Amino acid sequence: MRSPLMILAVLCVFFCAAAAGSSVTAEEKLVPGSQVACEVKVKSGGKDVTMRYWRFVPKGYNGKKSFPLMLFLHGAGERGDNLEVVKKWGPPKLVRKRKDFPFVVISPQCPRGTWWKVEGLYQLVNHVAGSLRIDRQRMYVTGLSMGGFGSWHLMDRYPKLFAAGVPICGGGKADSAKNLVGIPIWAFHGDADGVVKADLSRVMIKEIEKAGGKKARLTLYPGVGHNSWSRAYANEDVYKWLLSHKSGGGKTGGGRK
């Protein structure tokens, strides 16, 4: 007769192995045309942080052809630990019906009470680009409200990371314009936005142009308040415009100090 300790040891080995196996499956198993919850360890503010995110892989992905990548950054209202709320707006909402959406979409969640940390986002992009067949010359960033600010900041900090960006109802630092002159940017804002003033987008485009940039543009929606993202993300021309841009090699190493 086996001792209780031996039985306990065998059970521990079995369940630990099963748990490890399920973890690997959740992260590595790909179901084209679906959006799955994932997580990755990143360094942020000198600490190890677990970043949770949605990962959408389009129908037709088979690991042979490289696909464009889109990073989506949500607004302040979707922060927290309930990943489902990230699918409320934008690309993660869109792909629930658009199984053939022509991008791999990654939609991380920002913890409650914090703001987007670009170092962690940079690591997330590199993690996904290194684990899937991603066209590194076609990586894009977009976000709304707080995510619009995050998009501007990320492009400023890592100007060679993305081929183009679509910041919506956000804003950046005017003195960062010199770092953005080479990036195609299509910003959107409602001119009646009472939460994030449209002047924040106007100033960024103006400063980029003053610095010599010719690739930035702004669409203002007359009479529209803070929610300019519903119109922007419903515009098919946005996705065609993104796909029309390629970076000069998709270099992801190192950012601006």
For each feature predicted by the language model, list its residue ranges:
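Active-site machinery of serine-nucleophile hydrolases
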Residues: 69, 73-123
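Alpha/beta-hydrolase-fold catalytic nucleophile elbow
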Residues: 108-109, 142, 168-169, 188, ...
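C-terminal catalytic histidine-bearing segment of alpha/beta-hydrolase fold enzymes
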Residues: 184, 188, 194-257
